[in-house]
């Protein structure tokens, strides 16, 4: 250690000041004070003392950036050479205490908050002191009066003068000494009673306009034990001030009881004097400080999304709680050691650990953490009670997978830079950077870290005497921020205390944070080179509970080993109930189990006659019919895999599916052949035409056995690259789902299931085969009937349906058409395909109180569904539940580590249900299907792309998607596939597709297009509509096209979807085409369409589906039209006549058919049409505007 150089007075004085603050005899001039244990509070005090001792200006940043006496002296000499006349800060001038003074910048937001939420205890400071022995209440009362007399701020009130807040010092303030005697209570009850009184004291409001500003209450716990409760509004105090009060109370009490005069040093200024000086000082530096902060915080996210137990309310109520935890001495010692090694403060290391925890909890890598700083940048304020504390917003950068040591170094730099500019009041920063604020959360900062190392908390009590601080004086029942971590030193390490928003977080969740922080810090300090992303958050037992106990689903399901293929499972039931009705159609036709299997066996043998090998792909393009079910079952019995195709899809898409899958045979109906493409190499079999082989067909040979690992079906889903991708599902996983359903939902007497899901969606698999494996009857909805909620309601009643599946958006439309009659047969409703909202769930229970509602989840890549939850009314959320039999679910971070309960992560699916992979896409299969590190050897898991979280009870909650995949009216689609299709047109320079709309029935696809050439917007929209109609299925076609000059980007260069304009601000769904509506019916319908579609004007030639309509809106539209015209209109009418003029004529025709009095209206409607319009009326059904369910 080099002794201070006596010939360098500046260096010597700086070294002496630091030695005093560090409680050392001396320090070397080249010593890094932060390696010697200096804290940020010490740096502020050192700056104030050096300014005064050397009579020189000294920016706080210089102290942080020049951490040795020699380096700081060199910087001071350099600044003097460039500004030789500069001198230190002037003393604060006393002001007239009888006049009103302005508030300080720190007080202004507190005063405003009190005005906005009077009685809210958020900004109340409350702490407790313990006392042992005899307490002289008279002496204590005298001490309190002395303190109030000494510190004018405790005699200050805050009136409004000319509509502006002000502070006014009173000559005197009476502070009554409250008492609560608990000695009469049993000793075991006293702590509870004391806590109740402390909470009441902490939560009682203050009247800032009249005072008093201090409450003191003594709790008598025994004859020799007392607790002193002190409560003040934050507008007059801070943590530093609290220690001053404790120190002075101790000094005064000791002096008065000893009969000697108190020796407290006189105060050079009072708080209201400082208020005037603060504004004058800031006036000269504010612009420079604002410039720095504006640049430093550019692009910072406005909200830190901590995992919460409840959704954030529209208006923050600041209700809260507090919870203590310990940071062990072994962790504290290593934390302080790392700080010294890195030449930084323990606060910087603790903040790095806290930022790492927040990063792991939220997935965000750009974090803003608030830190309270003392704000006492002048020595004359060190002994003054008052609100000086300021909040500094520290930006923590966790991007790029840093090690913990790298994160500490990053944090040290930003702490130094930010603390060096702490003079700017936080609320001025808020006014500048967040002028428009949400009432739901605090601006800029929602999380705070407060290392409470005020001068009297550096390992010492705040003044020797009879009163000692207790760890927590009482819960105010409020919280300033979403989450605050207070940390103080303790005899066994550090003591942490969480203050949390109880509207967001359960106490149990917050209780998990302390152990998680300690576990993370312990590992990080043991291996500082370890990436933050790999640091553990949980003890092994907690981790094992999630990946093992909550996935303990191994089970032997009904049917035994002979039920591991669909043909075996279904044939066994046919043998048990051969004469039971298996299928029933809309017109009452029926097939028994015997008839169904005879037909399927005959077709299976016909397929085998084409030389098909096991797992050959056979395409099935059929509307709902007997032939459709027979075809599917026959393909399976032949040992082949079926490829379902929507016969209404564009021919180009169908051709791609046939070509990509290598389908050898296409099974269809004659009426579909005109819409099918030429399929080279594919044999087309029309099922409703005679078999050319006639009586020559083999009817006796045995059909092949099917292994569980054999391919059952190939279903194509939307692909992000612009190409659909085929998912390969085997018999074993599918049978696992069917057999689990047989046990979970056993059929009762007369079980009847409505089959309404198109076969190219995998829900149809269990809809059909669960029914046919249990002996129940499958009622086939008419083709396109699944889009018509009124029709479906009728079928449920007429057929006595007991079980039905809905995607949530269609369930909402179904509930809109009215209740089922008394005595209806419906027992169970199944939901999947979209998130089920609590509101929709409760609507169903209100309408159908005795019906079971089951929420299921699963992608096509995991055999239909892998989780299940039976819903109950009134719960705050609708979970997706727990894994079904033999399924495993993991919620993992980007490193494939399990995340703690409550923390969002990506949902990975394992166990028996996992599909084989993607057909012909080995690269994508390797990317999405990985070895399962938590399952049995050789098992795999599937990356779903869904965000989820575990509840603490082992139940899963779905949180949405992390990529461009969306679910729209139950249809899974990749926005990238739509974008790629549209971007392929030469006139498109850039395109973004997004989902817009509020409720589930209003959501629609909108394409935002930047044209390659300006001035051709309308022509381009028409061209893109035609392109989408030719290449995309109806459910993937955008309803609206909005042209943009440029696509908005985030600061990181990604598409900013939140900044995309509402369709109404760009292009309303195209409308107003052709002549204006001319007949009364057209005008009535045009108004209905315009209201539903948000269109400005609707023309007579507008197509409902081209101007923004979809199947659910069609259901609402026909419902309104039915009411308006007094006639029941099926939803199919909108698909058959999607043009307004045609639809209007169809409506009045329907009226005429049901009401003879409407005949005249029909004639009037026809007469109102011009001859040319009559000639233009279609002879056949209008264009197909079909959409998915």
Swiss-Prot record:
Gene Ontology cellular component terms for the protein in this record: cytosol
Any one GO BP annotation for this protein: antibiotic biosynthetic process
Region (Adenylation): 572-969
SUPFAM superfamilies to which the protein is assigned, alphabetical: Acetyl-CoA synthetase-like, ACP-like, CoA-dependent acyltransferases
Region (Disordered), start-end ranges: 75-97, 454-476, 1045-1081
GO MF annotation: an example: phosphopantetheine binding
Cofactor annotation: pantetheine 4'-phosphate
UniProt pathway: Secondary metabolite biosynthesis; bialaphos biosynthesis
Superkingdom field: Bacteria
Domain Carrier intervals: 5-80, 1076-1151
Biased composition (Basic and acidic residues): 455-472
PTM-bearing positions, type O-(pantetheine 4'-phosphoryl)serine: 40, 1111
Region: Condensation, residue numbers: 100-541
PROSITE patterns hit by this protein: AMP_BINDING, CARRIER, PHOSPHOPANTETHEINE
EC number: 6.2.1.67
Catalytic activity: holo-[peptidyl-carrier protein] + L-alanine + ATP = L-alanyl-[peptidyl-carrier protein] + AMP + diphosphate
Signal peptide: none
Keywords: Antibiotic biosynthesis, Ligase, Phosphopantetheine, Phosphoprotein, Repeat
SMART domains: PKS_PP
KO phenotype (gene knockout): Mutant cannot produce PTT. PhsB cannot take on the function of PhsC and vice versa.
UniProt record similarity statement: Belongs to the NRP synthetase family.
Described function: Involved in the biosynthesis of phosphinothricin tripeptide (PTT), also known as bialaphos (BA), a natural-product antibiotic and potent herbicide. Adenylates L-alanine and loads it onto a peptidyl carrier domain via a thioester linkage to the phosphopanthetheine moiety. Shows weaker activity with aminobutyric acid and L-serine.
Domain notes: Modular protein that contains a first peptidyl carrier protein domain which bears a phosphopantetheinyl arm to attach the activated amino acid, a condensation domain, an adenylation domain which activates the alanine residue into an aminoacyl-AMP ester and a second peptidyl carrier protein domain.
Protein name in the entry: Phosphinothricin tripeptide synthetase PhsB
Gene that encodes it: phsB
């Amino acid at each position: 250690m080099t002794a201070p150089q006596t010939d360098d007075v500046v260096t010597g004085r700086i070294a002496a000041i630091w030695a005093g603050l560090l409680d050392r005899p001396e320090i070397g001039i080249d010593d890094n004070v932060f390696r010697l244990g200096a804290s940020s509070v010490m740096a502020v005090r050192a700056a104030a003392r050096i300014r005064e001792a050397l009579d020189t200006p000294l920016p706080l940043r210089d102290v942080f950036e020049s951490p040795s006496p020699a380096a700081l002296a060199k910087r001071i000499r350099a600044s003097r050479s460039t500004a030789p006349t500069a001198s230190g800060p002037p003393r604060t001038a006393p002001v007239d205490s009888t006049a009103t003074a302005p508030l300080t910048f720190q007080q202004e937001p507190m005063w405003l908050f009190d005005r906005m939420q009077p009685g809210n205890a958020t900004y109340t400071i409350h702490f407790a002191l313990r006392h042992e022995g005899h307490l002289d209440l008279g002496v204590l009362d005298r001490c309190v009066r002395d303190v109030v007399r000494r510190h004018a701020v405790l005699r200050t009130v805050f009136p409004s003068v000319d509509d502006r807040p002000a502070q006014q010092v009173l000559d005197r303030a009476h502070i009554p000494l409250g008492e609560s005697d608990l000695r009469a209570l049993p000793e075991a009850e006293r702590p509870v009673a004391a806590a109740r009184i402390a909470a009441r004291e902490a939560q009682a409001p203050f009247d800032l306009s009249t005072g008093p500003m201090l409450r003191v209450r003594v709790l008598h716990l025994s004859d020799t034990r007392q607790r002193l409760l002190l409560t003040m509004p934050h507008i007059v105090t801070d943590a530093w001030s609290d220690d001053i009060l404790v120190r002075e109370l101790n000094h005064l009490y000791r002096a008065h009881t000893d009969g000697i005069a108190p020796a407290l040093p006189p105060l050079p200024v009072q708080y209201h004097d400082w208020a005037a000086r603060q504004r004058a000082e800031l006036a000269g530096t504010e612009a420079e400080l604002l410039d720095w902060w504006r640049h430093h915080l550019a692009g910072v996210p406005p909200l830190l999304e901590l995992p919460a137990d409840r959704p954030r309310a529209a208006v923050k109520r600041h209700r809260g709680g507090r919870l203590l935890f310990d940071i062990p001495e072994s962790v504290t010692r290593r934390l302080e050691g790392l700080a010294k090694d890195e030449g930084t403060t323990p606060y910087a290391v603790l903040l790095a650990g806290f930022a790492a925890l927040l990063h792991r909890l939220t997935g965000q890598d750009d974090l803003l953490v608030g830190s309270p700083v003392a704000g006492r940048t002048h020595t004359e304020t060190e002994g003054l009670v008052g609100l000086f504390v300021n909040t500094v917003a520290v930006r923590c950068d966790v991007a790029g997978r840093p090690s913990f040591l790298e994160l500490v170094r990053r944090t040290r730099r930003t702490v130094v830079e930010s603390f060096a500019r702490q003079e700017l009041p936080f609320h001025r920063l808020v006014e500048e950077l967040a002028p428009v604020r949400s009432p739901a959360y605090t601006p800029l900062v929602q999380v705070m870290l407060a290392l409470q190392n005020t001068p009297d908390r550096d390992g010492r009590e705040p003044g020797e005497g009879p009163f000692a601080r207790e760890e927590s004086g009482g819960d105010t029942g409020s919280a300033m921020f979403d989450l605050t971590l207070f940390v103080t030193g303790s005899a066994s390490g550090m003591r942490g205390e969480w203050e949390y928003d109880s509207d967001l977080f359960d106490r149990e969740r917050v209780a998990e944070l302390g152990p998680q922080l300690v576990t993370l810090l312990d590992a990080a300090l043991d291996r500082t080179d370890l990436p933050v992303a790999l640091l553990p958050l949980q003890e092994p037992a907690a981790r094992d509970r999630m990946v093992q106990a909550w996935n303990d689903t191994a089970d032997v399901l009904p049917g035994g080993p002979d039920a591991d293929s669909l043909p075996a499972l279904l044939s066994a039931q046919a043998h048990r109930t051969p004469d039971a009705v298996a299928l029933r159609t809309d017109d009452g036709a029926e097939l028994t189990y015997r008839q169904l299997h005879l037909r399927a066996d005959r077709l299976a043998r016909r397929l085998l006659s084409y030389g098909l090998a096991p797992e050959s792909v056979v395409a099935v393009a059929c509307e709902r019919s007997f032939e459709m079910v027979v075809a599917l079952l026959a393909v399976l019995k032949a040992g082949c895999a079926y490829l379902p195709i929507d016969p209404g899809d564009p021919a180009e898409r169908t051709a791609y599916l046939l070509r990509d899958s290598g389908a050898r045979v296409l099974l269809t109906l004659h009426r579909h052949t005109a819409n099918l493409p030429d399929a080279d190499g594919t044999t087309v079999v029309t099922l409703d035409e005679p078999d050319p082989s006639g009586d020559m067909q083999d009817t006796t040979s045995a059909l092949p056995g099917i292994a569980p690992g054999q391919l059952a079906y190939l279903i194509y889903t939307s692909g992000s690259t612009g190409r659909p991708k085929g998912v390969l599902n085997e018999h074993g996983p599918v049978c696992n789902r069917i057999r689990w359903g047989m046990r979970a939902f056993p059929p009762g007497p007369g079980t009847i299931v409505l089959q309404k899901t198109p076969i190219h969606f995998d829900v149809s698999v269990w809809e059909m085969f669960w029914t046919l494996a249990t002996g129940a009857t499958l009622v086939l909805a008419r083709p396109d009937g699944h889009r018509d909620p009124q029709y479906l309601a009728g079928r449920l009643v007429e057929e006595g349906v007991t079980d039905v599946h809905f995607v949530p958006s269609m369930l909402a439309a179904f509930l809109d058409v009215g209740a089922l009659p008394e005595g209806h047969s419906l027992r169970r409703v199944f939901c999947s395909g979209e998130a089920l909202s609590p509101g929709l769930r409760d609507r169903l229970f209100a309408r159908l109180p005795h019906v079971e509602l089951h929420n299921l989840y699963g992608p096509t890549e995991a055999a239909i569904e892998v989780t299940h939850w039976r819903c109950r009314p009134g719960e705050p959320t609708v979970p997706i539940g727990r894994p079904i039999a033999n399924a495993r679910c993991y919620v993992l971070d980007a490193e494939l580590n399990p995340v703690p309960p409550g923390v969002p992560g990506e949902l990975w699916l394992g166990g028996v249900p996992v599909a084989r992979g993607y057909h012909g896409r080995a690269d994508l299969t390797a990317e999405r299907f990985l070895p399962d590190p938590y399952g049995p050897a050789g098992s795999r898991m599937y990356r779903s792309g869904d965000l989820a979280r575990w509840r603490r009870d082992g139940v899963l909650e779905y949180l949405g998607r992390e990529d461009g995949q969306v679910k729209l009216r139950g249809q899974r689609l990749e926005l990238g596939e739509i974008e790629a299709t549209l971007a392929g047109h030469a006139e498109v320079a850039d395109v973004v597709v997004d989902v817009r709309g509020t409720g589930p029935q209003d959501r629609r696809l909108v394409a935002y297009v930047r044209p390659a050439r300006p001035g051709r917007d309308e022509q381009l929209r028409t061209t893109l509509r035609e392109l989408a109609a030719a290449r995309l299925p109806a459910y993937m076609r955008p309803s609206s096209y909005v042209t943009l000059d440029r696509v908005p980007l985030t600061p990181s260069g990604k598409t900013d979807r939140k900044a995309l304009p509402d369709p109404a601000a760009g292009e309303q769904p195209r409308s107003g085409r052709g002549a204006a509506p001319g007949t009364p019916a057209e005008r009535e319908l045009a108004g209905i369409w315009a209201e539903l579609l948000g269109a400005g004007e609707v023309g007579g030639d507008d197509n409902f589906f081209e101007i923004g309509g979809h199947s659910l809106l069609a259901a609402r539209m026909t419902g309104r039209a039915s009411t308006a015209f007094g006639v029941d209109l099926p939803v199919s009418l909108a698909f058959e006549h999607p043009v307004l003029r045609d639809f209007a004529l169809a409506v009045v025709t329907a009226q005429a058919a049901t009401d003879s009095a409407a005949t005249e209206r029909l004639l009037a409607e026809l007469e109102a049409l011009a001859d040319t319009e009559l000639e233009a009326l279609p002879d056949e059904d209008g264009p197909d505007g079909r959409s998915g369910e």
